[in-house]
A protein has these predicted regions:
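Active-site hotspot residues in diverse enzymes, especially metal/ion-binding acidic/histidine motifs
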Residues: 1-214
Length: 214
């Protein structure tokens, strides 16, 4: 598989977002994950109970794959997920819990897998890895042990939080070009504005804070 840097992934995001804007006829106040996934890669979503522990948030496959995954449940039943490259399953608890930020990140994350698979079909070989699970972690841990997930997480952040939208809301909320101290106790005013910014963008505060550092 290709080893892509943050700069590489940002350049990819710029091309993809430009394409998305040409397909949309409205002002962008935030990236709509469902609309984005459908327009860019024809991906649709279905909600399901992904795991008993909540450790798996999403499941999808690259294009040209047709398979069914059977997952044993605690009550002795078996749940089947049919994958064909056009559907991604998302953990139902994300919607039930009202966690909009984590839900949106997961939706774009699944689309980002498809985008990388389309750009690098030989490297992201479906026969070698026919399906992909998204684990419950928005952070990019170091040292990197899973380049597929690291690259997908970074691309997701660039797609969901383009620099233009960040700069726009930083200006509108009076945060300037940089938040020097992000702390709920020692900088409550800035933290409240930062929280409002995350709400407007439809992301978690964790995802936004990571994006602001990169």
């Amino acid at each position: 598989m290709p080893i892509l840097s943050r700069k590489d992934l940002e350049r990819i995001s710029r091309r993809v977002l430009f394409r998305y804007l040409t397909l949309s006829d409205r002002k962008m106040d935030r990236i709509d994950p469902v609309d984005f996934a459908e327009k860019i890669c024809g991906l649709h979503f279905a909600f399901a109970d992904m795991s008993v522990t909540g450790s798996i948030l999403g499941l999808t496959s690259y294009s040209d794959v047709d398979l069914t995954i059977s997952v044993p449940r605690g009550n002795g039943s078996v749940q089947e997920f049919h994958l064909n490259g056009n559907i991604a399953y998302v953990d139902q608890n994300l919607a039930n819990a009202g966690s909009v930020g984590r839900l949106n990140f997961t939706l774009v994350h699944e689309a980002a897998h498809q985008i990388l698979g389309m750009l690098y079909p030989e490297e992201y070989n479906p026969s070698a890895q026919p399906f992909i699970c998204r684990l419950a972690d928005e952070r990019c841990s170091y040292p990197i042990t899973d380049w597929v997930e690291w690259q997908t997480n970074v691309l997701t952040a660039y797609l969901l939080l383009p620099r233009e939208l960040i700069d726009r809301y930083m200006d509108e909320l009076g945060l300037g070009r940089q938040i020097k101290l992000l702390n709920k106790v020692f900088a409550p005013k800035e933290y409240a504005l930062f929280s409002e910014m995350a709400k407007r963008l439809g992301v978690s505060k964790t995802a936004l804070s990571i994006r602001l550092d990169n």
